[in-house]
Amino acid sequence: MTPISVTQLNNQIKSIVESHFEIVLVEGEISKVVYHSSGHLYFTLKDENSSINCAMWKSNLTRMKFRLKEGEKVYVYGALSVYVPRGEYKIIAQSIEPSGVGALQKAFEQLKEELSKLGYFDEARKKSIPRFPRRIAIVTSATGAALQDMLRVAGKRWQLTEIYLFNALVQGDGAAEDIAMKIKLADEFVFEDGSGFDLIIIGRGGGSKEDLWPFNERVVADAVYNASTPIISAVGHEIDYLISDFVADVRAATPSNAMEIALPDKNEILLMLDEMKNAFVYKISHLIQKKERELIHIRELLNASSPVKKLDMKLQECELLLKRFNHSYINQIQKKEKELNELKNILFSLSPVIKINSFEKEIELLKSTFKNKTAQIISSKEKELINLKSAYETLNPKKREKKGFAEITKNGKRIDLKELKIGDIFDVSNADVLIKSKALEKIEN
């Protein structure tokens, strides 16, 4: 037998192994996982008795939906490859699937766990949805049924909100990146008045897990998390839960439900406004009635104690006295005239001319005296009435101030000069000016 070199032997082994094991599907447990900076993946696949080194090149690794972890059981699909310089062989993996669970589900669970630890799902960071949004941005496909469903609901509930579409791919290659870009664009959009969108809705209609997968991608989760605008996630049907649902501020069961959450119902608002109006009218009416009763009470108190009221009462008393006076003297005059007539009759019956003349003079004197006395009394009462009116004018603070008088108050109350003490702070005011004063010296007259 002719001897061969080590390299020759390894090359022969390589030729035999790689030609006979072009495709292998191996089940085992993951260990020694290394994600290299070059983008390649290196790991060991083992069972109870053996192990084999494995590698997955960057070109295939980019298609994996989940990351390998120590201790996981997987199916590795690939081919055997021999490294001639060291005589080592390994599996060059083309794809890796979790054992017992689908790759997509595994990727979903891994990303969900990772984002949860990072605080992406914390309720404390989530923003509230505005009750009356002025502008809403919808990130979805322009040709999808989800958009039409949302517009139909919006037309029924509330027509005052402006709705803008950011057309995006919602499935297939590049969809996740396109959705993330449109979320960022809507979040940073600024109108001419300086304001942005009040709310963003992302979503699409139902579909398979693969169809909905873009909303499970990390790039979409990051875009939702970093947005300053409140976001509603409305993907698929009620039974579908996506990563975007957990990160968004609010999760809607369907796109139609998202619009029901986002917009108020005009009929409910009208009913609420009607109830508020009725309650307001009732309260105002009740308040007006209460204030009217208080006003009447205050007027009664003012009328009972006002100088005008007192003056009116004095005037009425004077008028009553004048009436009584006039009535009394008229009666006396009538009585004297009656007596005079009687005397005249007696005198005429006796025909003593001298006595008649004497009585006539006496009567004339009585008349003159009566008239003078009456005039004096009337004049006296008129003067008394004038004095009462003058006293009223004097008591009126505004009249006094216009005549040069000033009012002295302390702590908002009128006070006599005699009541002031040295050091007291008081106000001196008339109709035009108020002077803050302090008593420095007190001299009694």
Swiss-Prot record:
Subcellular location(s) of the protein: Cytoplasm
InterPro entries: Exonuc_VII_L (IPR003753), Exonuc_VII_lsu_C (IPR020579), OB-fold_nuc-bd_dom (IPR025824)
Residue runs in coiled coils: none
UniProt keyword annotations, A-Z: Cytoplasm, Exonuclease, Hydrolase, Nuclease
CDD domains for this protein: ExoVII_LU_OBF
Predominant localisation class: cytoplasm
UniProt key word NADP: no
Catalyzed reactions per annotation: Exonucleolytic cleavage in either 5'- to 3'- or 3'- to 5'-direction to yield nucleoside 5'-phosphates
A cellular component annotation (GO) from this entry: exodeoxyribonuclease VII complex
EC nos: 3.1.11.6
Self-association and partners: Heterooligomer composed of large and small subunits.
Protein family (similarity comment): Belongs to the XseA family.
Function: Bidirectionally degrades single-stranded DNA into large acid-insoluble oligonucleotides, which are then degraded further into small acid-soluble oligonucleotides.
Protein name: Exodeoxyribonuclease 7 large subunit
Gene that this sequence comes from: xseA
